[in-house]
Amino acid sequence: MRSWNSLFCLNSSRPPGHIVYPKHQAGHTGKQADHLGSQAFYPGRQHDYLVPPAGTAGIPVQNQPGRPEGVPWMPAPPPPLNCPPGLEYLSQIDMILIHQQIELLEVLFSFESSNMYEIKNSFGQRIYFAAEDTNFCIRNCCGRSRPFTLRITDNVGREVITLERPLRCNCCCCPCCLQEIEIQAPPGVPVGYVTQTWHPCLTKFTIKNQKREDVLKISGPCIVCSCIAGVDFEITSLDEQIVVGRISKHWSGFLREAFTDADNFGIQFPRDLDVKMKAVMIGACFLIDYMFFERTR
């Protein structure tokens, strides 16, 4: 079976909508990783999610004033039916790359500054820009457990997704204070939640819709560490028998991993997945980043 790194390289060279999963081997009784369509993911809830129509990406647009330069923006495709404003970009893709920017203040003085991220498609075109909205005291006193508001904006600076994380104890031995993040799209309108599920050994989360109904599961390793390699978190069906996607923390090199918080992530999901659930998976990725990969000052 191909390694995740080879799959990531293969998928990054394919056009949107062509995700490659490991083929099912004869005699294999483990989890299935085949793309089985959106109906396999939400048994009995197909009416809650609309399958977006197919489309093609266009020519990259120019960089907008006041935003990071050097990377073209993905052009906006036609919005699907009942699509929240700004989420139409997600209807055309099956992979997202998230790159955290290096903050000079953190490198030189070990002060925790506001995290900022670039969110790109598999072609390297920027889709969104994400910025943490917290104050200095909260960042440096609460560390990785801090509450935050993460504002995700499009190419014209319009806030299209808001992530809200409340203050919770970041201790795996305390099942009464499990982590949670709320995803809003547009701001003020919840579209889903990601909640930590207590387990004595493994890292587990549950993806919920706007009604707080369980939709998908996320399972990670027993020990979450990216000291020498990447880390994968599998997105599965509720019975954890079908793998429908993956959140991966990519190895960024020794110096970057040792001296900065600038992490790189990849998210894979079916192209025909509802855009709201794709936005919720983005929220799950940021929650995982803050919980496990923020350095303790």
Swiss-Prot record:
A lipid is attached at C172, C173, C174, C176, C177 (S-palmitoyl cysteine). Residues 294-297 are extracellular. It comes from the Eukaryota. It catalyses: a 1,2-diacyl-sn-glycero-3-phosphocholine(in) = a 1,2-diacyl-sn-glycero-3-phosphocholine(out). Its main location: membrane. The chain crosses the membrane at residues 277-293. Coiled coil: none annotated. It is a single-pass type II membrane protein. Residues 1-72 are annotated as: Proline-rich domain (PRD). It is found in: Membrane. The modification Phosphothreonine is found at T149. InterPro entries: Scramblase. Residues 1-276 are cytoplasmic. GO terms for cellular component: endoplasmic reticulum; intracellular membrane-bounded organelle; nucleoplasm; nucleus; plasma membrane. GO terms for biological process: plasma membrane phospholipid scrambling. The N-terminal proline-rich domain (PRD) is required for phospholipid scramblase activity. Belongs to the phospholipid scramblase family. May catalyze calcium-induced ATP-independent rapid bidirectional and non-specific movement of phospholipids (lipid scrambling or lipid flip-flop) between the inner and outer leaflet of the plasma membrane. This is Phospholipid scramblase 2. It comes from Homo sapiens (Human). The gene is PLSCR2.
